[in-house]
């Protein structure tokens, strides 16, 4: 519960001589009522810490966390013994002059031809989004997983995630393009409710693409989520129930 997480954070911080730069708690309710296996009866309580000094997040931290948990949580166990911290990375966007990146065409006979950079370039400008088709006429609906009619793929782009969703028929596209809005996505994926989301229609593919900014923290190597590359984000969306 939230109260337990707050209490754990307070008690752990009091036990530490130095507080890490970042400390995050998550509770995954993987437990089931009247489970027939121990794993099925257990929840996963995770604490992630980050700091530039490996000593602060190493054995000093893990030992304090384990000792505190053993003294307070009945049935507490760990997924790994106390140990040293692991290196993580931070994604930062950067740019280099185009002339500094060699572009070479290699022909089948092995001949290499340098390709000079373009002499003229244009600034990126916004493109008018394609118009949406007329929504389907109102009628009876069924409460079903979105994946009943829609496919999806997802993945990482720096600290953001892409989700592409598509359907097979024009009738389904009329529904998808008008029903799966940014607001609808926020409701279906509550973890993205407070994040900036971009929506891009691809009518020739009967598809819509979403970009969820910042959901991966500072990139894949930052390990902000248990699914750091957002590969399962699309399947989570497909599993959510909607009125079709």
Region locations from a protein language model:
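Short flexible coil/turn linkers enriched for glycine and charged/polar residues
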Residues: 41, 157-159, 204
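Conserved phosphate/anionic-ligand binding catalytic regions in large, soluble enzymes, centered on
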Residues: 152-171
